[in-house]
Amino acid sequence: MNAIRRLYALTVWLSTLLSAAVAAAVQASAAPALPEQLHDTGLFAPGQPDMLGAGVEAFEPQHPLWSDGASKRRWIRLPPGTAIDARDPDRWRFPHGTKLWKEFSHGRPVETRYLELGADGQWRFATYVWSADGRTARLAPAGGLTLSVEGAPAGRYVVPSRDDCLACHTGARSPVLGVGALQLGQDLPRWMREGRLRDAPPAWRERAPVLAGVTEAERAARGYLHANCGHCHHGAGGVPVPLVLAQDVAGNAAPAPAQLHEALRRMSTREPTQQMPPLSTRIPDPHGQALLRAWLDQVPVSSIR
């Protein structure tokens, strides 16, 4: 059984690395240079680092990604006169020129990650590292780096390489994680009314879709798995493993109890060949573990195979 588990982990790891390598080669081909400083990406108003740039809006996903206890803030900007194509409710298509930012903090801002959809239809990924005084943020090396940060696990903070960013984002249903019908909650009806979405179900104007589930514990666990595992385990490409943890608007995805136990086991370890997610986390998430245990406590023993 241990040999099978290690083969499974190796398959996932190699698939992730291959996806990142291919995507990195595509991104590097004739791509314009990334801005050297965060303020040149448009997040802030010109000359006013305490004010958001024109058209930039904050948002908060209902089910956030675990990031080793870091606090996060997120923003999005759509080009004027454009809207997100939501005709496929689970695979939104963003207009060229879309920009997104995510700030990671441990008592102070440490890094801000940046996504931009170019005119060529290719997503570009970058990370900006903040100065200790929080006044400026500069482009990090493409290979990433490790910082000494008070409050981070063991005082060390790993800024991901661009290949690491690509490994998670390019294997997902959409390269944009955390922005979708099941994540925006009550922001979704507002976005509909403001014209930020097109070709979306009219019912979203009044009410956002909810995760499937009989109990609140089940819905909470599904949401956690969707946000933390579903970008790879979605059954439409991603990793070549028969495990679907992404949820969809129709509520079709339902992992078997035995799969839930395996997901919990991998969430609870940081052994390199076993841990899930395989990247960007060095300590398990106690809240996520508690959510899965609460759901499993409600599953009849007879259904666990």
Language-model segments: what does each one mean?
Residues 26-78:
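N-terminal pre-domain segments of enzymes
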Residues 9-23:
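Bacterial N-terminal signal peptides
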Residues 1-6:
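N-terminal secretory signal peptides that target proteins for export/translocation
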Residues 94-97:
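Short, well-ordered loop/turn sites that connect or cap secondary structure elements
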Residues 26-29, 91, 109-305:
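Sequence context surrounding c-type heme c attachment/ligation sites in exported
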Residues 84-89:
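Short alpha-helix capping/helix-loop boundary micro-motifs
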